[in-house]
């Protein structure tokens, strides 16, 4: 846990309240929290409605009588968020449909082709499942077509944990239907026992398609999945 790591890393604990420029709040909250928690071991803060703020906490091993520790950490986070902001502004404008062809250059797994190959399989599986769920096949196939394109983005390269999530943001920003955006966001769910499952039918169709393709594919090449997580 971040709490135990942050407090355990210092002997004489001093908690300092810092802040960053409010303009960075336009960046998706997942990027902000990951930058603060995973990269810097900072503690983000939230208002009474659960909305992230521009203030964060750090744990220091000495008193900051001159305010230099506070200033130094604020400079560090602003530099990191400036990079994230640059990637966000660049990536969100990249046409997702045109990015599909780039998946031909990204291997999914040896023996299972590229991510482009996987996307074609997901389109077929998703179409079959959409017929069973009596939902729009067009939406499911569109979701499947662009669901892996965020893997080519700078942001997912920097924050691999955000694959799918960033794709959902990109799709929403580019005007795709909200069902399509949510399906992309939730395609990997559930990740483990402590995460929720997709509830919307389009999200269910894409998530199940992705897992079926992975399971059948790995058994097909005699690579039996062994994990505590869903494939």
Task: Show the residue positions of the predicted features.
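Single conserved hydrophobic/aromatic residue that forms the stacking wall/gate
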Residues: 1-11
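Extended, Lys/Arg-enriched charged tracts that mediate electrostatic binding to polyanionic substrates
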Residues: 9-46
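Negatively charged sequence features
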Residues: 22-28, 34-35, 69, 73-87, ...
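Histidine/acidic-rich helix-loop-helix segments that form or flank divalent-metal centers
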Residues: 24-29, 144, 177-211, 216-231
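Extended active-site and interfacial segments that coordinate phosphate-rich ligands
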Residues: 37-40, 51-85, 221-226, 230
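Alpha-helical phosphate/pyrophosphate-handling elements in metalloenzyme active cores
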Residues: 42-44, 49-51, 55-63, 71, ...
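Active-site-adjacent bridging/hinge elements
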Residues: 51-53, 92-104, 182-185, 212-219
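Active-site microenvironment for binding and transforming phosphate-containing groups
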Residues: 147
């Amino acid at each position: 846990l971040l709490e135990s790591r942050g407090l355990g890393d210092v002997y004489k604990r001093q908690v300092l309240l810092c802040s960053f420029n409010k303009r960075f709040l336009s960046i998706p909250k997942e990027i902000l929290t990951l930058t603060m928690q995973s990269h810097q071991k900072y503690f983000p803060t939230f208002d009474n409605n659960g909305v992230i703020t521009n203030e964060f906490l750090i744990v220091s091993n000495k008193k900051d009588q001159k305010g230099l520790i506070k200033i130094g950490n604020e400079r560090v986070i602003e530099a990191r968020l400036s990079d994230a902001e640059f990637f966000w502004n660049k990536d969100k404008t990249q046409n997702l449909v045109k990015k599909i062809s780039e998946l031909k250059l990204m291997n999914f797994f040896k023996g299972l082709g590229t991510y482009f190959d996987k996307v074609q399989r997901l389109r077929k599986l998703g179409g079959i499942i959409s017929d069973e769920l009596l939902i729009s096949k067009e939406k499911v196939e569109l979701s499947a077509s662009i669901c892996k394109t965020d893997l080519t983005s700078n942001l997912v390269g920097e924050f691999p944990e955000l694959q799918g999530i960033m794709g959902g943001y990109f799709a929403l920003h580019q005007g795709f239907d909200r069902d399509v955006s949510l399906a992309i966001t939730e395609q990997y769910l559930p990740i483990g026992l402590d995460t929720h499952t997709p509830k919307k039918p389009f999200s269910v169709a894409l998530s199940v398609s992705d897992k079926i393709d992975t399971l059948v594919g790995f058994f097909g090449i005699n690579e039996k999945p062994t994990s505590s997580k869903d494939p």
